Swiss-Prot record:
Family as reported in the entry's similarity comment: Belongs to the universal ribosomal protein uS7 family.
Keyword list, A-Z: Ribonucleoprotein, Ribosomal protein, RNA-binding, rRNA-binding, tRNA-binding
Organism of origin: Chlorobium phaeobacteroides (strain DSM 266 / SMG 266 / 2430)
Coiled-coil spans in chain: none
Pfam families, sorted: Ribosomal_S7
HAMAP family: Ribosomal_uS7_B
Record-given protein name: Small ribosomal subunit protein uS7
NCBIfam families: rpsG_bact
Protein role: One of the primary rRNA binding proteins, it binds directly to 16S rRNA where it nucleates assembly of the head domain of the 30S subunit. Is located at the subunit interface close to the decoding center, probably blocks exit of the E-site tRNA.
A GO-annotated cellular component: small ribosomal subunit
Gene Ontology biological-process annotations: translation
Lineage, top ranks: Bacteria, Pseudomonadati, Chlorobiota, Chlorobiia, Chlorobiales
Amino acid sequence: MPKQNKYKGVSVDYRYGDESVARFINAVMLDGKKDVATRIVYDAFTIIAEKMNGESPLEVYRKAMSNIAPVVEVRSKRVGGATYQIPMEVKPSRRGALAFRWLKLYAKRRGGRSMAEKLAAELMDAANEQGASVKKRDEVHRMADANKAFAHFRF
């Protein structure tokens, strides 16, 4: 018998039938309130559909996720009393998780309006390669590029 059960995955969301959207809803969820998170995400998609004439909100979401997701990041490793920031490639599952986390964080930090409006604005900005979450991805990439000299210390 295995020590840990196999990962079962996430069921698809009921409106778009997309596993990535279901994962994003789970990332937006606070205190187990999935209905609230679902309403926020679907309202944001409705706002995107209204503002981006003719473009599918799912396509905007996918484009935003690909623009936010980091390819490399730095990880700390202690070697001989010194700690080095070592650039490492990001696994696909972590790539998505970081994109969700940054999108939620920077949408929440936007001023005023409802969370759905802030999330829609951040998604549209990210799809156009703007916004705070894209800047965060660029910052992470710059850190990895600056520490390229320590790449030979890989784990």
